[in-house]
From Swiss-Prot:
Superkingdom classification of source: Archaea
Name of the protein in its database record: Uncharacterized protein MJ0951
Family assignment from sequence similarity: Belongs to the TmcAL family.
Length: 355
């Protein structure tokens, strides 16, 4: 397949995702929830397990650290992976390495029982997608949430707090146990911060009437695994360099794609022309925070993506600029995204099931 044809197909999929997000802002697919519950009951009976374990991971790609956490989770029940998918933009705001259907297959081969589609992380702030994530866990019936963590002094206090049934509040340079008021520390590693944010969002949504109290299972992260190194090696076909970081199932999928000459054409990329068109010609107040829209509209026209990025202010998140590019790429109005989050999940979309 020619490069132009590949980009056309990827753009077609991207635009279909966009339309689906817009539709999901104003509808509920009740049948999808019933169908999902039926499948869960069948798997519970087959596996002779009664608990539902849910985790949220990008699997970009799935490595041994992911598999280790998955195996620890499966000790407690059937395992459901929530895989962010629509628009194929990561929490960092950049395109995923491979599409969600390939990543879902990696999860199934690694041992997951079901993979469902999660929220479109790349166009959301961390609070927005955390809200969607917890609401999805609730809708899936999650009873146990396994999470990998990096050992550090403040994190040990966070774990102790959560294990007591308490919740965490995250403030700039202050991590607090909500119920006791104890200051646990000043900051956390970014991966540990996700756990604290999940706890905080559960508390917040329960205050809004959700009634969700899952048990966390904390899994110490495996050392010596780098997602960046894995992706760099895959780009160059150096699978021997990373065979100790990837489970055989992931390695098999990647090598098969590489040997068949399909890997490079499946690697996802930005639609830079679309971003430039939005930045130069559209009403940016419709899609971006007003302060960002004001800056970009004053500085346009732009000739390339770097000019846009260099014009953007620094946000609270280090991925702020890339997320703004994803917003320009997606052209989903702020009002529509807000309705989408309020209505989330509009459906349970199953990406893969273990047969």
């Amino acid at each position: 397949m020619l490069i132009g044809e590949i980009m056309d197909l990827n753009l077609k999929n991207f635009l279909e995702d966009r339309e689906e997000i817009i539709r999901d802002a104003k509808r509920k697919d009740e049948k999808s929830f019933k169908d999902f519950k039926k499948i869960v009951e069948e798997i519970k009976e087959r596996e002779n397990k009664d608990k539902i374990v849910c985790d949220f991971t990008e699997y970009n790609p799935l490595h041994k650290g992911h598999k280790y956490a998955l195996e620890k989770g499966k000790e407690h029940g059937i395992f459901i992976s929530v895989l962010p998918g629509p628009l194929e933009r990561s929490g960092r705001g950049i395109p995923y390495f491979l599409n969600r259907y390939i990543r879902a297959e990696m999860a199934i081969r690694a041992g997951a029982d079901i993979v469902v589609e999660g929220p479109p992380m790349g166009i959301m702030g961390s609070g927005q997608y955390m809200r969607c994530l917890i609401k999805m866990f609730y809708s899936l019936g999650a009873e146990i949430i396994p999470r990998g963590y990096i050992p550090e002094k403040t994190m040990e206090k966070v774990i102790d707090c959560i294990n007591k049934g308490y919740h965490i509040q995250v403030k700039p340079y202050k991590i607090i146990c909500i119920e006791t008021g104890e200051i646990l520390g000043e900051k956390l590693n970014i991966d540990n911060y996700v756990i604290a944010s999940m706890s905080q969002m559960i508390y917040k949504l329960n205050r809004e009437g959700l009634k969700f109290n899952p048990k966390f299972v904390f899994v110490k992260r495996l050392e010596g695994i780098s997602g960046t190194k894995i992706r760099e090696a895959i780009f160059s076909g150096k699978f021997e360099d990373i065979k100790n970081m990837l489970p055989k199932t992931t390695l098999s999928i990647l090598k098969e794609l590489y040997d068949n000459g399909k890997l490079n054409e499946l690697i996802l990329k930005r639609f830079e022309d679309r971003i430039l068109e939005t930045a130069n010609e559209y009403d940016l107040y419709e899609y971006l925070p007003s302060n960002v829209a004001e800056i970009l509209e004053k500085k346009r026209p732009f000739n390339n993506i770097e000019e846009i990025k260099n014009s953007l202010p620094y946000g609270f998140s280090r991925h702020f600029r890339e997320r703004i590019l994803s917003k320009l790429e997606a052209r989903i109005p702020n009002e529509t995204l807000s309705k989408y989050i309020n209505n989330y999940p509009a459906k349970i979309k199953i990406l893969a099931v273990k047969l």
